[in-house]
């Protein structure tokens, strides 16, 4: 589609409407740790901590959708309807397991969080706020359920009827710690902030007055939920070792802080007055003992991020306005410069995904193009290969469609921006080694964007479409324990269409697709894929949900209330193991409006537990059953036991995905294109980049110049193949020193009183230095060659389309001190 500049035409808004802010954010998610991103003009969406947070407000109604249908139907042609049998007595079973709760308040927004895993505990915070001329009046109510939302109890008295600051959300502790922190609003003249803490799954709360005013939500250590850190409004870094009972300021002038492994804290600090003034000159510090001792591990820092086992820093280059990514795998003790193009002030880097084996890195293109290049790393995170050109990633708002399909290893989906400004979806099944278009669903026709009505592709709507306010209520959905299932909105043609999308499903991790539902829907997965539930996205009141017990082939509709509600959100426990779904919305009369939830338990639909005969063997990534390499991805095959579509039974909460791996012989598919090589579109072999032909491949690693001899291939990080093809590849140490990083803490840590000593030493050694230079010039031929080789590699990076430009200081002018979201998203 053409890149929309605003909301799509024809999207009507109901004056009072409903706004859904649906955020499913697991704690410490790497997902997209964006480095250097120029901040959006508006404040970013607030991020709730904890396993999952869902927030709804009374704004903006959804655009109109199809009228809900009753009964049952099959995806595809109407003639196939007779293939779908009606589940016996499902209406009576669901009616007996539908629970309504009406919330007796008129709050304008609702936030919901699960506390713990499989505990059934849900906290709901409702907020009502009226801004007055000078101050604002606010009221909060807190509700608790311990049966997955079937019943709620008002526990506002446990927080002394205090107004809770919704921008901090509900900070839920990791794992099953049962810890909850709510940040309260305090009067302007107070010495510090106030929090309410619970360590028993919100049965009781303790009020604690803070010695500082918090700037950010309390951050739990992933290893010990008693350890907390927070930033103050005065940029102090505060740490608690006893779940917030007592706090200690361990450092001042802090811009951004993050927990690392083993309770390590990384943070940036300014030295010249403010984070804004020092952007690009920040220092990166580390403490391994909660603030007793510190080590400066980097200077000239623009931003930093964590992903997998890698620590990243964006560093200002010497005597330049460009930045380079540096990588450490030992918590910052040593650094190496990533073999990536440098970026200018108006550009950014973004960590799209990172695990223990590799990194997906986006490098923005110069200018306001809205796209860049995806690079994939080696297992050290240092040497990168080009993976995908013209990757859509807008600078305004910072939107990318990059999606990790968690239901099948190695699969990612994203969008590219074509030269005609149309947006197309691409998918990789081998962790970025090769990208291709999504296959056209068999039960769909090509739309008006297709030049050939018989040949087109499926294009997926994700974050970018949502940001442009298209009629797309949800991003793509997949779950690790619902093997192979992917659900997404999309259109079928030559590019993404602005027309009303339909919902598509894949049951094999994205290899094949089928239209599942007509028109936009909200959807969720229950019982590890045993049930899929959907609700139509409509601006009219609704009272119908749809569900499928065969991975979206056949659908039943159920009227959950006789009084339709204005729908605001669909909520289910994270992890896709629950049998319960909650429908949230409100009812409205002439003068009143009330929040209401309906929780539907599907336990009686799947009455029996699944047995061995209910499962069948499925070979993942299978595309050619006659080929001995069929199913080989990243060096091995995986056979799964999957629930038969015809089996109506319950996987249960204890269900564990059963899989049997087997190693494959190595082939071209097990190799990425090496440094200096790329795969043309729809090609399997790697070819040399034109701008590198005739040049020797040399790069700087750990301060030593290395020479690369390659046939164009390097093994994909994490690939398990053995034997078979083994392309020649050799890295040789040239025994020459080079600049492997721009971080040099020792220079920054020099005290001012050491300057005379340094000057004296320099004066005494001046003659020796001059003589040494003359000797080197006369007898050593490698020095000039070394500098030349390094500059050649830099020219290659620039020729690759990401050269350094004169800065317009977009990033700096947009940065503001009161938000850590500007440095890393």
Curated annotation (Swiss-Prot):
Positions of short motif Endocytosis signal: 785-790
Keyword annotations: Cell membrane, Cleavage on pair of basic residues, Developmental protein, Differentiation, Disulfide bond, Endocytosis, Endoplasmic reticulum, Endosome, Glycoprotein, Golgi apparatus, Lipoprotein, Lysosome, Membrane, Nucleus, Osteogenesis, Palmitate, Phosphoprotein, Receptor, Repeat, Signal, Transmembrane, Transmembrane helix, Transport
Residue ranges that the UniProt entry lists as topological domain Cytoplasmic: 776-825
Membrane topology: Single-pass type I membrane protein
Annotated S-S bridges: 84-554, 255-275, 446-456, 610-649, 632-664, 666-721, 673-686, 700-738
Keyword Cell wall biogenesis/degradation: no
Record SMART domains: VPS10
Chain positions of BNR repeats: 143-154, 196-207, 238-249, 285-296, 326-337, 375-386, 426-437, 504-515, 546-557
GO biological process: D-glucose import; endocytosis; endosome to lysosome transport; endosome transport via multivesicular body sorting pathway; extrinsic apoptotic signaling pathway via death domain receptors; Golgi to endosome transport; Golgi to lysosome transport; maintenance of synapse structure
Region (Disordered): 804-825
Prosegment location in residue numbers: 32-73
Region of interest called Intrachain binding of the propeptide and the extracellular domain, as start-end residue ranges on this chain: 48-59
Residues bearing the modification Phosphoserine: 809, 813, 819
Interactions with LRPAP1 and NGFB: annotated segments: 610-754
Region: Golgi to endosome transport and interactions with GGA1 and GGA2, residue numbers: 777-825
Residue intervals on the Extracellular side: 74-754
Cleavable signal peptide: 1-31
Modified how: The N-terminal propeptide is cleaved by furin and possibly other homologous proteases. Phosphorylation at Ser-819 facilitates the interaction with GGA1.
TM region positions: 755-775
Function recorded in the entry: Functions as a sorting receptor in the Golgi compartment and as a clearance receptor on the cell surface. Required for protein transport from the Golgi apparatus to the lysosomes by a pathway that is independent of the mannose-6-phosphate receptor (M6PR). Lysosomal proteins bind specifically to the receptor in the Golgi apparatus and the resulting receptor-ligand complex is transported to an acidic prelysosomal compartment where the low pH mediates the dissociation of the complex.
Entry note about domains: The N-terminal propeptide may facilitate precursor transport within the Golgi stack. Intrachain binding of the N-terminal propeptide and the extracellular domain may also inhibit premature ligand binding.
Quaternary structure, from the entry: Interacts with the cytosolic adapter proteins GGA1 and GGA2. Interacts with numerous ligands including the receptor-associated protein LRPAP1/RAP, NTS and GM2A. Forms a complex with NGFR which binds specifically to the precursor forms of NGFB (proNGFB) and BDNF (proBDNF). Interacts with the Trk receptors NTRK1, NTRK2 and NTRK3; may regulate their anterograde axonal transport and signaling. Interacts with LPL. Interacts with PSAP. Interacts with SLC2A4. Interacts with NRADD and NGFR. Interaction with NRADD protects against degradation in the lysosome. Interacts with CLN5.
The family this protein is said to belong to: Belongs to the VPS10-related sortilin family. SORT1 subfamily.
Protein name: Sortilin
């Amino acid at each position: 589609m053409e890149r929309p500049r605003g909301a799509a035409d024809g999207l009507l808004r109901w004056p009072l409407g409903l706004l859904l802010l649906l955020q499913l954010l697991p704690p410490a998610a790497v997902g997209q740790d964006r480095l250097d991103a120029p901040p959006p003009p508006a404040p970013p969406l607030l991020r709730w901590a904890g396993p999952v947070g869902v927030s709804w407000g009374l704004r903006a109604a959804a655009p109109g959708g199809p009228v809900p249908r009753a009964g049952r139907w099959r995806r595809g042609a109407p003639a196939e309807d007779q293939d779908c049998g009606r589940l016996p007595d499902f209406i009576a079973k669901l009616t007996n397991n539908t629970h309504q709760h009406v919330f007796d308040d008129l709050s304008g927004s609702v936030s919901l969080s699960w506390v713990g895993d499989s505990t059934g505990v849900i906290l709901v915070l409702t907020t009502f706020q009226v801004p007055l001329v000078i101050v604002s009046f606010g009221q909060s109510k807190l509700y608790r359920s311990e049966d997955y939302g079937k019943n709620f109890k008002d526990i506002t008295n446990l927080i002394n009827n205090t107004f809770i600051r919704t921008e901090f959300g509900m900070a839920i502790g990791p794992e099953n710690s049962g810890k909850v922190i709510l940040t309260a609003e305090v009067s302007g003249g107070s010495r510090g902030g106030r929090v309410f803490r619970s360590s028993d799954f919100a049965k009781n709360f303790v009020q604690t007055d803070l010695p500082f005013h918090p700037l950010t939500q309390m951050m739990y250590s992933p290893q010990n939920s008693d350890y907390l850190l927070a930033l103050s409004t005065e940029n102090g870094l505060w740490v608690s070792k006893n779940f917030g009972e007592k706090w200690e300021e361990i450092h001042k002038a802090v811009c951004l802080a993050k927990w690392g492994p083993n309770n390590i804290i990384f943070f940036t600090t300014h030295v010249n007055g403010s984070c804004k003034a020092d952007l690009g000159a920040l220092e990166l510090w580390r403490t391994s003992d909660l603030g007793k001792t510190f080590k400066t591990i980097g200077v000239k820092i623009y931003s930093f991020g964590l992903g997998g086992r890698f620590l990243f820093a964006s560093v200002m280059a010497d005597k330049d306005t460009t930045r380079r990514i540096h990588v450490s795998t030992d918590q910052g003790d040593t650094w190496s410069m990533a073999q990536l193009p440098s970026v200018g002030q108006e550009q950014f880097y973004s960590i799209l995904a990172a695990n223990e084996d590799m990194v997906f890195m986006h490098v923005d293109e110069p200018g306001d193009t809205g796209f860049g290049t995806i690079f994939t790393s080696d297992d050290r995170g240092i040497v990168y290969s080009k993976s995908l050109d013209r990757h859509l990633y807008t600078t305004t708002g910072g939107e990318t469609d990059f999606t990790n399909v968690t239901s099948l290893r190695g699969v990612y989906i994203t969008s590219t921006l074509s030269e005609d400004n149309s947006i197309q979806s691409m998918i990789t099944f081998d962790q970025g080694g090769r990208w291709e278009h999504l296959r056209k669903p068999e039960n769909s026709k090509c739309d008006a964007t297709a030049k050939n009505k018989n040949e087109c592709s499926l294009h997926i709507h994700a974050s970018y479409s949502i940001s442009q306010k298209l009629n797309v209520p949800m991003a793509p959905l997949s779950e690790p324990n619902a093997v192979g299932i992917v659900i997404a909105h999309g259109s079928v043609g030559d590019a993404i269409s602005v027309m009303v999308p339909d919902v598509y499903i894949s049951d094999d991790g994205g290899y094949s697709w089928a239209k599942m539902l007509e028109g936009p829907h909200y959807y969720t997965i229950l019982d590890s894929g045993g049930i899929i539930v959907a609700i139509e996205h409509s601006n009219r009141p609704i009272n119908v949900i749809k569900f499928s017990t065969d991975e979206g082939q056949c659908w039943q509709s159920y009227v959950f209330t006789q009084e339709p509600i204005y729908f605001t959100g669909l909520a289910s426990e994270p992890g896709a193991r629950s049998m319960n779904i909650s429908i949230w919305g409100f009812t409205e009369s002439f003068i009143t409006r009330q929040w209401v939830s309906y929780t539907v338990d599907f336990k009686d639909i799947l009455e029996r537990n699944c047995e061995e005969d209910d499962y069948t063997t499925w070979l993942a990534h299978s595309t050619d059953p006659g080929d001995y390499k069929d199913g080989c991805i990243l060096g091995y095959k995986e056979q799964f036991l999957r629930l038969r579509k015809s089996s109506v039974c319950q996987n249960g909460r204890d269900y564990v995905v059963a899989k049997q791996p087997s190693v494959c012989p190595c082939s071209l598919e097990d190799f990425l294109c090496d440094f200096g090589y790329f795969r043309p579109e729809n090609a399997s072999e790697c070819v040399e980049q034109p701008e590198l032909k005739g040049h020797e491949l040399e790069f700087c690693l750990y301060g030593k110049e290395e020479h690369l001899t390659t046939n164009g291939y390097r093994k994909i990080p994490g690939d398990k193949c053995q034997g078979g093809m083994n392309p020649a590849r050799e890295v040789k140490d040239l025994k020459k020193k080079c600049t492997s990083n721009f971080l040099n803490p020792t220079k920054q840590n020099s005290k001012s009183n050491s300057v005379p000593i340094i000057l004296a030493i320099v004066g005494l050694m001046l003659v020796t230095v001059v003589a040494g230079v003359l000797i080197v010039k006369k007898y050593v031929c490698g020095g000039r060659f070394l500098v030349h080789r390094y500059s050649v590699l830099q020219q290659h990076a620039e020729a690759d389309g990401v050269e350094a430009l004169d800065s317009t200081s977009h990033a700096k002018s947009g940065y503001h001190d009161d938000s850590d979201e500007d440095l890393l998203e």
